[in-house]
Amino acid sequence: MKVGVALSGGVDSAVALYLLLKEGHEVKAFHMKTKEDEFFLKKEIKKKVCCSPSDTADAIRIARSLGVEIEIVDVREVFREKVIEPFKRDLLRGLTPNPCVHCNRYVKFGYFMDYVLSQGFDAFASGHYARVEFSGKYGKKVIKKGVDGKKDQSYFLARIEPWRIEKLLFPNGIYTKEEIRRIAEEAGIHVAKKQESQDVCFIPDGSIENFLKDEGITLSEGKVITEKGEVVGHHRGYPLYTVGQRKGLKIEKFGERLYVREKIPESNVVVVSGLEGVFFSGLIAVDPVWHVDLPEEFRCVCRVRKKAEEAPAIVRVKNSEVEVRFEKKIFAVTPGQIAAFYDEDTLLGGAIIKEGIP
C-alpha cells in the first residue's frame, strides 16, 4: 500500500513511519510548516512545542536515516485561517477554545491529508495514540482509544470528518509510550528520547496574553463578581481565565475559595462562585460531528476535556444541537471546549460546548 506519513520530527511519528516500513508499505514522509521559522526564533520557549525549526530538521534527519523521501508542506495560510483566527475570535467571545481539535479537523486531517492523498497515496498515517478498526456493531471502520490510557489521543480526533477514517492508519495505537520509545532506540532513531510537545504550537511561550498582544489586542482589567453581583476583586482580562480556574484571580475579599463560573465579555466581567457552582448536571453543545449513525437519543460516556474523567450520560440530538445530561454532576463544563462521546473505547464523535447546565 502507498502510505503518506505525517512526520512531525518527534518520536511518535518517527516510529509510525518505521513500523509502516517494516510492514512493507511504500511510504513517503510529509512535514507541515504552520508558522515561519523566525516566529519561533524570537520567542522565549518555555516548553517543547511542535512545528518549530528544530522539528523540521529532525523530520528531515529521520526520513533520511530511514531511506524515505520527505516533502515539506506549507500550511501557514490555511492554519491561520482555520486555527489561529478562530482561536482569537473565540477567546474574545469569552470561550476557551481547543485549537488542537480544530487543527486536526481543518488542517492535519483536512487540507494536509487532502494534499497527501492527491499525490496518489492510498492512506494517510500519523503517530497518534489511537486505533482504526472495523466495528461489527456500527458496520464500518471507527476510531478507538489507544491502548495506552495515559497517552490516548482519540479526544483530539472527535471532530474529523467521518469519511476520512477509512483512509487513516495509526500504527502506534496498539503500543504504550514506553514501547514506542524502546522501538525507536532499537531502530537507532535519534529522537528516541526527545521531549514531548507541551504547549499550543503558535503560543510557544505559553502566554495567551502575549499571543493577543502580538495580534494587536490589548486586554483591559475588569471586575470579578459573585453570582449575586458583589464585587470581590479584579481580573487582568477575561480571555485569560477559564471555567473552574482558581489560581490567578485577584480576590480582595471573601471567606471561601472561589472559582471562575462564567465570563461576560460584553461587560468585561468574570463571575465566580464556590466549588458547588462550577459543577454541572449537563451541557448544550453545537455543530456535532458523528462518526457513526446514532439515534436521536442514546446513552454513552462523555469527556469534556482531554484530562477530564469520562461521565456516563444520556445524549439527545436535535439537528445541530446536542443536549447532554450526566448521571452525576461534573466539574467545569467549559464553553468552547469539545465534548467527545464514546461507546466504551469507540469514539462516536464530538461537538463544541455552548454552555453548561447547572
From Swiss-Prot:
EC number from the UniProt entry: 2.8.1.13
UniProt: ATP binding residues: A6, L7, S8, G9, G10, V11, D12, S13, M32, G127
One GO cellular component term noted in the UniProt record for this chain: cytoplasm
Family matches, as Gene3D superfamilies: Adenine nucleotide alpha hydrolases-like domains (2.30.30.280), HUPs (3.40.50.620), Translation factors (2.40.30.10)
Taxonomic superkingdom: Bacteria
Region (Interaction with tRNA): 151-153
Keywords: ATP-binding, Cytoplasm, Disulfide bond, Nucleotide-binding, RNA-binding, Transferase, tRNA processing, tRNA-binding
Site-annotated residues for Interaction with tRNA: H128, Q337
Broad class of enzyme this protein falls into: transferase
Subcellular location, principal: cytoplasm
Keyword NAD (UniProt): no
Membrane-traversing stretches: none
Cysteine disulfide links: C103-C201
Protein's UniProt keywords contain Nucleotide-binding: yes
Catalytic activity: S-sulfanyl-L-cysteinyl-[protein] + uridine(34) in tRNA + AH2 + ATP = 2-thiouridine(34) in tRNA + L-cysteinyl-[protein] + A + AMP + diphosphate + H(+)
InterPro entries documented for this protein: MnmA-like, MnmA-like_C, MnmA-like_central, MnmA-like_central_sf, Rossmann-like_a/b/a_fold
Annotated localization: Cytoplasm
Active site: C103 (nucleophile), C201 (cysteine persulfide intermediate)
A single BP term in Gene Ontology: tRNA wobble position uridine thiolation
Family to which this protein belongs: Belongs to the MnmA/TRMU family.
Protein function: Catalyzes the 2-thiolation of uridine at the wobble position (U34) of tRNA, leading to the formation of s(2)U34.
NCBIfam families reported in the protein's UniProt record: PRK00143.1, trmU
Name by which UniProt lists this protein: tRNA-specific 2-thiouridylase MnmA
